[in-house]
Amino acid sequence: MMQLMLYASTLITSIILFKMNHPLAMGLMLLIQTIQISMLTGLMAKSFWFSYILFLIFLGGMLVLFIYVTSLASNEMFSLSMKLTTISLFIFSMILIINILLDKSSISFFIQNNEMQSIYNLNMFLQENSLNLQKLYNYPTNLMTILLMNYLLITLIAVVKITKLFYGPLRPMN
């Protein structure tokens, strides 16, 4: 049920993104969509490490884009369209209601004892998490991890070089 909700909200933010015309509003929608996609990948992988790293990479790119947009865009205010917001909330609530009515197990999920369920889930998560992390750092996938580390280092060096005060595209105009 959680995945269906995230899929629906990702679809709605994608539709809203096409209707935006201000760069800061588009950046906000892109950040919200990045959070949703990171949550979806974490739910699919049973470990949130990969989605956390993915979110940090996207957030670093978004910060660089935010610097460019704030230095180049005008100082006009932006506001969300009330019509678009109400339509998206209506669609999202309809998907939620239809999902609850069609999926009877989602109703029994709210009736269960939450304390015992959380203890059981924590125990299962700890057992599966150690196996997933071993798979991440063993032979076939350790090359991908090293490649990701090198990519992040090169990106960090490039961003530092680009954002020097008197060199590059971010220098002040006189």
Swiss-Prot record:
Pfam family, one: Oxidored_q3
Entry's Gene Ontology molecular function annotations: NADH dehydrogenase (ubiquinone) activity
Bilayer-crossing regions: 24-44, 48-68, 82-102, 143-163
InterPro entries referenced in this protein's UniProt entry, alphabetically: ComplexI_Subunit6, NADH_UbQ/plastoQ_OxRdtase_su6
Keywords: Electron transport, Membrane, Mitochondrion, NAD, Respiratory chain, Translocase, Transmembrane, Transmembrane helix, Transport, Ubiquinone
Swiss-Prot/TrEMBL catalytic activity: a ubiquinone + NADH + 5 H(+)(in) = a ubiquinol + NAD(+) + 4 H(+)(out)
Enzyme Commission identifier(s): 7.1.1.2
One Gene Ontology cellular component: mitochondrial membrane
Chief location bin: mitochondrion
Location(s), subcellular: Mitochondrion membrane
Enzyme class name: translocase
Membrane topology: Multi-pass membrane protein
Family: Belongs to the complex I subunit 6 family.
Function: Core subunit of the mitochondrial membrane respiratory chain NADH dehydrogenase (Complex I) that is believed to belong to the minimal assembly required for catalysis. Complex I functions in the transfer of electrons from NADH to the respiratory chain. The immediate electron acceptor for the enzyme is believed to be ubiquinone.
PANTHER family: NADH UBIQUINONE OXIDOREDUCTASE SUBUNIT ND6, NADH-UBIQUINONE OXIDOREDUCTASE CHAIN 6
Protein name as annotated: NADH-ubiquinone oxidoreductase chain 6
